[in-house]
UniProtKB/Swiss-Prot annotation:
One Gene Ontology cellular component annotation held by this UniProt entry: plasma membrane
Gene name for this UniProt entry: Or1f45
Transferase listed as a keyword: no
Membrane topology, record value: Multi-pass membrane protein
PROSITE patterns reported in the protein's UniProt record: G_PROTEIN_RECEP_F1_1, G_PROTEIN_RECEP_F1_2
Residues glycosylated per entry: 5
Name used for this protein in its record: Olfactory receptor 1f45
UniProt KW keywords: Cell membrane, Disulfide bond, G-protein coupled receptor, Glycoprotein, Membrane, Olfaction, Receptor, Sensory transduction, Transducer, Transmembrane, Transmembrane helix
Organism field: Rattus norvegicus
Cellular location(s): Cell membrane
Physiological role: Odorant receptor.
């Protein structure tokens, strides 16, 4: 059997963000704090929406799904980083690496699809308010979420199967803090043109189509707001989209910076900085972005916290 095949590499080494011990300790602390904030913040959002009947609407249904996906997204990478630091190890098995890559891609795709679905919800609410309840039915909302899961898993399974066929020879060091597609393609000693072609074609379609839907939705929303006679009324309508727009810019800005450049132009430091933004920082910020200027959400969160920590008389 040839020595230059897939079985010659049984594990990869995740080099992480830094090799300096002091920086590693600081990064461990930062990642731990951000991960705890991500889990706590998003679970509070889910709990608040589930316990407050006023929030049982399509917008908050999609938001609770986004919060669930964000917890899963962050949990795909950060716990492994923390565990490796505690154990003093950099290793991840070949199968573990592909598994991590698969779930990272699935949850990333789900973020993408849910942001598009949420923009459609805002489009219907602002542009067709009288037909909102008849258009955004519970059946449609469930169908949109389930359909997103199906498409995300099918898309990611295709890319993982293409990745699994590659051969990895002597070099098994990944200059990243998790298993990502671009570093793995660079390590492969096989022809990766098909993988790169699929990322830039099929992968781009899956990523760009929801983004185009978001743009179209906001063009219609902007036109509808500009037609409102009262500036105050128009601003109030558009302000409900502000949180969603902030998350869209944060998510797509970092993803495009990493995944839609030629592989030869990728710089490890820049890619990792962008990866920290979309895989760690964005899931942490989403609960704050969606709740800071939302009075209904803040009231629901106060209610949940009051139930958990009742004030002493």
């Amino acid at each position: 059997m040839s020595s230059t095949n897939q079985s010659s590499v049984t594990e990869f080494l995740l080099l992480g963000l830094s090799r300096q011990p002091q920086q590693q300790q600081l990064l461990f602390l930062l990642f731990l704090i951000m991960y705890l904030a991500t889990v706590l913040g998003n679970l509070l959002i889910i709990l608040a929406i589930g316990t407050d009947s006023r929030l049982h609407t399509p917008m908050y249904f999609f938001l609770s799904n986004l919060s669930f996906v964000d917890v899963c997204f962050s949990s795909t990478t950060v716990p492994k980083v923390l565990a490796n630091h505690i154990l003093g190890s950099q290793a991840i098995s070949f199968s573990g690496c592909l598994t991590q890559l698969y779930f990272l891609a699935v949850f990333g795709n789900m973020d993408n699809f849910l942001l598009a679905v949420m923009s459609y919800d805002r489009f219907v609410a602002i542009c067709h308010p009288l037909h909102y309840t008849t258009k955004m039915t519970r059946q449609l909302c469930v169908l949109l979420v389930v359909g997103s899961w199906v498409v995300a898993n099918m898309n990611c399974l295709l890319h993982i199967l293409l990745m699994a066929r590659l051969s990895f020879c002597a070099d098994n060091m990944i200059p990243h803090f998790f298993c990502d597609g671009t570093p793995l393609l660079k390590l492969s000693c096989s022809d990766t043109h098909l993988n790169e072609l699929m990322i830039l074609t099929e992968g781009a379609v899956v990523m760009v189509t929801p983004f185009v839907c978001i743009l179209i939705s906001y063009i219609h929303i902007t036109c509808a707001v500009l037609r409102v006679s009262s500036p105050r009324g128009g601003w109030k309508s558009f302000s409900t989209c502000g949180s969603h727009l902030a998350v869209v810019c944060l998510f797509y800005g970092t993803v495009i910076a990493v995944y839609f450049n030629p592989s030869s132009s990728h710089l490890a430091g820049r890619d990792m900085a962008a990866a920290v933004m979309y895989a760690v920082v964005t899931p942490m910020l989403n609960p704050f972005i969606y709740s800071l200027r939302n009075s209904d959400m803040k009231a629901a969160l106060r209610k949940v916290l009051a139930m958990r920590f009742p004030s002493k008389q």
